[in-house]
């Protein structure tokens, strides 16, 4: 009797996709809509991050899910509505970050195996969705670029946390690098100086003083070792030197304080009000810590603080746009990316 034994061929793994290198630009985040519900969803994710609010104890959770998320979203929704890109139905931060990624990709188009994408740390498009998409496109190496010139645990570090969290759930992990802060890179300082000069040249007045306003943070975070304040100071020192301005002509301040703790000082709003009260009539504000214009620049500075200045005796106020997707801004990101991709291209 003849016995026929079927022979099973071993499973053949699919051929790997062509190897690519991914570059992921990451910005802070934005609500998906400018109504109360959309802002509440965004704020819950943002304020639940222990890198942002380090004390996530019971008292904070009760406060967050009680008073804060019941009252703050409606107020913030009104602020977002003032600056919302209604044509695209999205915040300016999303519009600009997308444009930055698109222009960066165009500037690197001669590197055929590069994939450039963008994500938000909070909100959409999420880092998880974009990292998974880049891996699916064959990216075996990934450069994550936090769009923060100055490092802070509340910004840059939480981007790293989330990137590693996503990688921890992947079987086939890409090799990953994270771009460092660029707070005193010559390309960044040059771009800031050129942007300020160009903007001031377009104004019908000459500012008596320029205020360099950075996002604030609790003083306690600095005392725990966060280098953010020192890097902000280094940026302004370099900018003063590049522009030939003394420390009485280019001031350093911190904005956007939240809660009752002491934050980095001097505070931007108080400084602007005092300048007006002291007789300063012409003022410009630049925000070097923001790679892209957003709620904090377009509404808080260009509207709220402008109103404060004008209502207290000031006569002329101008907010200098962030570098955004300008040629200078893209050149800064491009140089950073090419430097950090050395050995991979």
UniProtKB/Swiss-Prot annotation:
Pfam families: Ferrochelatase
Catalyzed reaction equations: heme b + 2 H(+) = protoporphyrin IX + Fe(2+)
Subcellular location(s) of the protein: Cytoplasm
Main location class: cytoplasm
Residues where Fe cation binds: 215, 296
SUPFAM superfamilies from the UniProt entry: Chelatase
Enzyme Commission number, as recorded: 4.98.1.1
Keywords, sorted A to Z: Cytoplasm, Heme biosynthesis, Iron, Lyase, Metal-binding, Porphyrin biosynthesis
GO cellular component: cytoplasm
Pathway(s) the chain acts in: Porphyrin-containing compound metabolism; protoheme biosynthesis; protoheme from protoporphyrin-IX: step 1/1
A molecular function (GO) term: metal ion binding
Xref: InterPro entries: Ferrochelatase (IPR001015), Ferrochelatase_AS (IPR019772), Ferrochelatase_C (IPR033644), Ferrochelatase_N (IPR033659)
Record function comment: Catalyzes the ferrous insertion into protoporphyrin IX.
Similarity field: Belongs to the ferrochelatase family.
Protein's name according to its UniProt entry: Ferrochelatase
């Amino acid at each position: 009797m003849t016995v026929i034994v079927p022979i099973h061929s071993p499973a053949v793994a699919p051929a790997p996709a062509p190897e690519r290198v991914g570059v992921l630009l990451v910005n802070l985040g934005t609500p998906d809509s400018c109504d109360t519900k959309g802002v509440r969803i965004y704020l819950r994710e943002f304020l639940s991050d222990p890198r942002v609010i380090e004390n996530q104890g019971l008292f904070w959770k009760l406060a967050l899910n009680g008073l804060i998320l019941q009252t703050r979203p409606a107020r913030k929704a009104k602020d977002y509505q003032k600056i919302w890109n209604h044509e695209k139905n999205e915040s300016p931060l999303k519009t600009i970050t997308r444009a930055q990624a698109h222009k960066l990709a165009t500037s690197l188009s001669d590197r055929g195996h590069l994939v450039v994408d963008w994500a938000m740390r909070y909100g959409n498009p999420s880092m998880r969705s974009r990292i998974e998409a880049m891996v699916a496109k064959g990216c075996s190496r990934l450069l994550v670029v936090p769009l923060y010139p100055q490092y802070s645990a509340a910004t840059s570090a939480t981007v790293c946390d989330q990137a590693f969290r996503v990688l921890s759930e992947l079987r086939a992990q890409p090799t990953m690098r994270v771009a460092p802060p660029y707070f005193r890179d010559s390309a960044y300082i040059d771009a800031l100086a050129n942007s300020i000069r160009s903007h001031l040249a377009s104004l019908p007045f000459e500012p008596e003083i320029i205020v360099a306003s950075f996002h604030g943070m609790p003083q306690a975070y600095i005392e725990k070792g966060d280098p953010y304040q020192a890097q902000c100071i280094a940026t302004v020192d370099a900018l003063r030197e590049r522009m030939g301005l003394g420390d009485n002509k280019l001031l350093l301040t911190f904005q956007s304080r939240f809660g009752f703790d002491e934050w980095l000082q001097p505070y931007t709003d108080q400084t602007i009000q005092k300048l007006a009260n002291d007789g300063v009539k012409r003022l410009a504000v630049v925000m070097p810590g923001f790679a892209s214009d957003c709620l904090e620049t377009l509404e808080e500075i260009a509207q709220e603080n402008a109103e404060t200045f004008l209502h207290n005796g000031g006569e002329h106020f101008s907010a200098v746009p962030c570098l955004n997707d300008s040629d200078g801004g893209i050149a800064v990101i491009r140089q950073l990316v090419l430097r950090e991709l050395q050995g991979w291209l």
